[in-house]
Amino acid sequence: DERDYDLEKLGNFIEENVDLDTVLSLAKEPLPAAPEECIPDKEADVTIGVAMDSAFCFYYQDMLDSFRRAGAEIKFFSPLEGDIPDVDGMYFGGGYPELHIAELEKSRTTHKLKDLSADGMPIYGECGGLQYLCTSYEIEERVYKLADLFPAETVMTKKLQALGYTKGQADSPIFRGEVRGHEFHYSVTDCASDSRLAYTMERGKGIVDGMDGIYEHNSVASYMHAHPGSFPVDDFVNSCRKYKQR
């Protein structure tokens, strides 16, 4: 068989040109150990609830690790299936709320968020989180009532509205400073004329007129997905700490 002949030639070539004993000895050596994560042994004194289910599932692990390094315990919960746990702040990441919009409209979590926001709990949302925290979300000409933290209405579009890297200066009640990240969405958000926007964008589209990060009380939400290396984690965790210690 021609294939057997080719394999025999290959075997002879390797035997003549490769130090097989050395290769085999190296194969027995253990691989270098993975570096240990440099999270200091710091006891958590504040708890942040992170929405995690099929509606909210886009998170950077580094962001969650940064919260822990800043002294926060992470408690996951599902706006689709459960209630809000006992927490000092909340984080709603990106995902696909439009695929679960009817369930979210009826969710216990949705109906409780406005009161928690008015009470001063720090609540942060990104993209899908922004859409969820607005007054309503229009999809295929049907309007769904949502959390109503912000005087803004979101409309799903068939056309891509934004895709690319972002950079902005944030001046919000719960964090300040430069924030970098990216945006990717098929929706537009129409804000009321008296809406307050915290991010002045140097790069990226944002919500409207070069601004992103709508805020009300201690709640902030943006189209930007913040990069963990630039997000003011300590500010946000300290805001949760102040809320807990009132």
Annotate each language-model stretch with its function.
Residues 54-56, 81, 96-98, 131, ...:
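Short, glycine-/Ser/Thr-/acidic-enriched flexible segments
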